Regions:
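Conserved alpha/beta-hydrolase "acid-adjacent" motif
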Residues: 133-142
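Short beta-strand immediately N-terminal to the catalytic nucleophile in serine-hydrolase-like folds
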Residues: 77-79, 103
Length: 193
């Protein structure tokens, strides 16, 4: 059994994110789903990002990082899109990280947005669609490839399509087939880490 800290995307803690967490729980894992937006949800990425900007991206990320202080160190850190910011920071900087799951997004491990190199002994999976304009168009795919090239246990899974939030069952962008495959891969990953 793994213990997972799962951070939501820029639309908030939606029922689709909670459903994903429930799927992991049904497979025998303990999953924490903090609400960084304190109950607020949004119907567009633009509105969600505007909400984040009001608080500040750094502060919102650090809010997630601080939540980990109340939990054990040997966690799997997971994030959907915006939630990758605190998840990846924790996986790269908090001692004892068990693994990382980066879904719909990935930060570089070198350059301005970096938290440093990928840590030894921390397995990672990265999941996104191969024509997602955010993941592909904004450089996340390059960051993911850099992690896969340098980390000892890393995998990038690309699914056919262009939807950003394809794994959130509560949204019109949901892709049932891709999401089912992602969920299966994640559960298999959690069984071995």
């Amino acid at each position: 059994m793994s213990e997972v800290l799962l951070f939501h995307h820029a639309l908030g803690l939606t029922s689709g994110v909670l459903k994903f967490a429930d799927n992991l729980r049904q497979a025998g894992h303990k999953v924490h789903t903090p609400d960084l937006f304190e109950g607020n949800t949004f119907n567009s990425i633009e509105k969600g990002l505007a909400f984040i900007e009001e608080t500040g991206f750094d502060e919102m990320r650090e809010r997630g990082v601080r939540l980990a202080d109340e939990l054990p160190h040997d966690l799997v850190y997971a994030g959907f899109s915006f939630g990758v910011l605190p998840a990846q920071k924790l996986a790269q900087t908090r001692p004892g990280a068990r693994a990382a799951l980066l879904i719909h997004s990935c930060l570089p491990i070198s350059g301005d947005w970096s938290f440093g190199p990928w840590p030894n002994g921390v397995p990672v999976q990265i999941h996104a669609m191969d024509n997602d304009p955010f993941f592909v168009g904004e450089g996340d795919i390059d960051a993911a490839r850099e992690i896969v090239e340098t980390a000892e246990d890393a995998a990038l899974f690309l699914y056919p399509g262009e939807e950003h939030y394809f794994a959130d069952s509560s949204l019109p962008s949901f892709d049932a087939e891709a999401s089912a495959l992602l969920t299966r891969r994640v559960i298999e990953f959690l069984q071995r880490v």
